[in-house]
Design a protein with these regions (language model features):
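ANL superfamily adenylate-forming
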Residues: 127-175
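Conserved AMP-binding A3 loop
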Residues: 45-49, 179-206
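Conserved AMP-binding/adenylate-forming core of the ANL superfamily
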Residues: 34-80, 84-88, 105-110, 172
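AMP-dependent adenylate-forming
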Residues: 21-46, 145
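Short beta-strand->loop structural element characteristic of the AMP-binding/adenylate-forming
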Residues: 74-76, 83, 87, 91-122, ...
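Conserved ATP-dependent adenylate/AMP-binding module captured primarily in the ANL superfamily
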Residues: 71, 102-136, 204-223
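Conserved structural elements of the adenylate-forming
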Residues: 52-57, 175, 194-219
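Conserved pre-ATP/AMP-binding loop-to-beta segment of ANL
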Residues: 30-33, 161-183, 190, 215-223
Length: 223
């Protein structure tokens, strides 16, 4: 068997975590457009400052709801704007994201929640809620529904959490800390959790950007 490899274009991170992508951009380039979201017939641009603020208030809501450092929080949904906010909010709060396919069966969801030790789950639709409610393990203390305007609900819940507490959570994460626990499809047995650290994602993102700088770094570039 032949093996091929190429040297990394970017060095492995020695400090920081994934939250720095948003927090640092909000600090140094607050008006820079970070993403666009569908709005009516068009698109709404979201700046670094706006994105950071929405993630922060959502993270405060998670903390107020009992999410502790290192807690696993599951998200069962398609790719959508709320996913991005919740993904980063869980990291800002010091937690670990557990993605679940939106097509997963109740049995699969139960296994993933139990095996991962998740303490909360966010689902996309009422149908998802109906699927997971009967099988929630006792460790799961919170179930949120995206279509119930979960971001606004969490923002309101976190009003009493101060910035210092949030920043302590966010800044305490090291590159080697677990960021996401992704489960395999389970075609040959029970789904297995794959551990991905902040360092894994940072290295991947850094090398992708460096390898496609004409796409990512040119003015106005987007994907």
């Amino acid at each position: 068997m032949n093996q091929y490899s190429v040297p990394a274009l970017e060095p492995v991170a020695s400090n920081g975590n994934l939250t720095n992508y948003i927090a640092d951009r909000a600090r140094f380039e607050p008006t820079r457009v970070m993403l666009s979201r569908p709005l009516g017939e068009g698109w709404q641009k979201v700046t670094a400052h706006e994105l950071d603020q929405e993630v922060r208030v959502t993270a405060k809501g998670l903390i107020a709801s009992g999410i502790k450092q290192g807690d696993r929080v599951a998200i069962m949904a398609r790719t959508r704007y709320e996913w991005t906010i919740l993904d980063f909010a869980i990291w800002y709060a010091g937690g670990v994201v557990v993605p679940i396919y939106e097509t997963s069966s109740a049995e699969q969801v139960e296994w993933i929640l139990t095996d991962s030790g998740s303490v909360a789950i966010i689902v996309e639709t009422p149908t998802h809620k109906e699927t997971v409610t009967p099988i929630l393990p006792s460790a799961v203390k919170n179930l949120w529904l995206m279509t119930d305007n979960v971001l606004a609900i969490l923002a309101k819940a976190g009003a009493s959490i101060n910035d210092d507490e949030l920043d302590q959570r966010r800044n305490s994460l090291a590159p080697s800390d677990l960021a996401t626990l992704i489960y395999t499809s389970g075609t040959t047995g029970k789904p297995k959790g794959v551990q991905l650290t902040h360092e894994n994602f940072i290295a991947e993102c850094g090398n992708v950007v460096a390898g496609a700088s004409d796409l990512f770094l040119k003015p106005g570039g987007s994907t």
